[in-house]
Amino acid sequence: MLTLKIAVYIVVAFFISLFVFGFLSSDPTRNPGRKDFE
């Protein structure tokens, strides 16, 4: 059960960091494929 909780925390932290990095580098010149988010 502890392993499952650790895996859930890793997945949640991964998605939060992915969202933060996508929000910080949201200028369309660096990643042109993300224009549909605006």
Curated annotation (Swiss-Prot):
<keyword id="KW-0602">Photosynthesis</keyword>
<dbReference type="GO" id="GO:0031676">
    <property type="term" value="C:plasma membrane-derived thylakoid membrane"/>
</dbReference>
<keyword id="KW-0604">Photosystem II</keyword>
<dbReference type="GO" id="GO:0015979">
    <property type="term" value="P:photosynthesis"/>
</dbReference>
<protein>
    <recommendedName>
        <fullName>Photosystem II reaction center protein I</fullName>
    </recommendedName>
</protein>
<dbReference type="InterPro" id="IPR037271">
    <property type="entry name" value="PSII_PsbI_sf"/>
</dbReference>
<comment type="similarity">
    <text>Belongs to the PsbI family.</text>
</comment>
<keyword id="KW-0793">Thylakoid</keyword>
<keyword id="KW-1133">Transmembrane helix</keyword>
<keyword id="KW-0812">Transmembrane</keyword>
<feature type="transmembrane region" description="Helical">
    <location>
        <begin position="6"/>
        <end position="26"/>
    </location>
</feature>
<dbReference type="GO" id="GO:0009539">
    <property type="term" value="C:photosystem II reaction center"/>
</dbReference>
<keyword id="KW-0472">Membrane</keyword>
<comment type="function">
    <text>One of the components of the core complex of photosystem II (PSII), required for its stability and/or assembly. PSII is a light-driven water:plastoquinone oxidoreductase that uses light energy to abstract electrons from H(2)O, generating O(2) and a proton gradient subsequently used for ATP formation. It consists of a core antenna complex that captures photons, and an electron transfer chain that converts photonic excitation into a charge separation.</text>
</comment>
<dbReference type="InterPro" id="IPR003686">
    <property type="entry name" value="PSII_PsbI"/>
</dbReference>
<keyword id="KW-0674">Reaction center</keyword>
<dbReference type="Pfam" id="PF02532">
    <property type="entry name" value="PsbI"/>
</dbReference>
<comment type="subunit">
    <text>PSII is composed of 1 copy each of membrane proteins PsbA, PsbB, PsbC, PsbD, PsbE, PsbF, PsbH, PsbI, PsbJ, PsbK, PsbL, PsbM, PsbT, PsbX, PsbY, PsbZ, Psb30/Ycf12, peripheral proteins PsbO, CyanoQ (PsbQ), PsbU, PsbV and a large number of cofactors. It forms dimeric complexes.</text>
</comment>
